[in-house]
Regions:
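N-terminal intrinsically disordered/low-complexity leader segments
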Residues: 1-16, 192-196
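Solvent-exposed, amphipathic alpha-helical segments
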Residues: 20, 24-31, 78, 113, ...
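Functional cleft and adjacent loop/helix regions within the main domain
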Residues: 68, 138
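Short, basic, alpha-helical segments at the C-terminal edge of helix-turn-helix-like DNA-binding modules
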Residues: 69-75
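Hydrophobic alpha-helical connector segments
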Residues: 77-111, 154
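Amphipathic alpha-helical segments used for helix-helix packing
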Residues: 101, 105-131
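Hydrophobic/aromatic-rich alpha-helical bundle segments in the mid-to-C-terminal region
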Residues: 126-136, 144-196
């Protein structure tokens, strides 16, 4: 059922309203930050009645979790697709380079959303479930081509280089990333665990 509307006015079915609110919440966060995100702003961005906010979500924290959950799932899926397409050690290294230069934080919006989530996770351990799951999926995707120790280093390398690329004002940033990519260890089957 939809939230009640004004008396005498027919209610239109809107099965996608909840999804639109979640997407609009991410847009509002990207523009105003978490601190500037309110029910009123999100409702206006989603073009829904204000009452829809509390109908579909228990509160702003509930909405933020849903929105950032969607963002991290989509980011992890892109990471998995890129690494999954690699078939050789050389392609795995190229995939890492492409993740940095094209996929992760590909837009200013993605950069802002990521850092807003990091700030929340630093303050509220509950949000670390989202960031930890994101890291787990990223390392699992890398693990198709690299051993566990290398995966942890590469995950941090991708994160750090991506932030530097996104914030760098010099146009040669992408060239520098590609040069660093050529220094990465060659991919290959993960090393077997040592005997216990």
């Amino acid at each position: 059922p939809a939230p009640p509307g004004p008396p005498g006015r027919a209610r239109r079915p809107d099965p996608e309203r909840r999804d639109r609110i979640i997407d609009a919440c991410l847009d509002v966060i990207a523009e105003h930050g978490v601190e500037g995100t309110s029910h009123r702003r999100v409702a206006a961005a989603a073009d829904v009645p204000l009452g829809s906010m509390t109908y579909h979500f228990a509160g702003m924290d509930d909405l933020l979790r849903e929105a950032f959950g969607r963002f991290t799932r989509e980011a992890a899926a892109q990471f998995e697709r890129r690494m999954g397409d690699a078939r050789t050690p050389e392609e795995a290294v190229q995939a890492v380079t492409t993740l940095i230069t094209h996929d992760v934080f590909a837009t200013q919006r993605d950069l802002v959303l990521s850092h807003e989530l990091y700030t929340l996770a630093a303050r509220d351990p509950a949000y670390r479930t989202l960031t930890n799951d994101w890291m787990r999926r990223s390392r699992a995707a890398l693990g198709r081509h690299f051993d566990p120790a290398t995966c942890r280093v590469l995950d941090a390398f991708i994160e750090g280089m991506t932030i530097h690329r996104a914030l760098d004002t010099e146009p040669h940033a992408a060239v520098a990333v590609r040069g660093a990519g050529r220094r990465l260890p060659r991919g290959g089957p993960p090393a077997p665990s040592p005997p216990r």
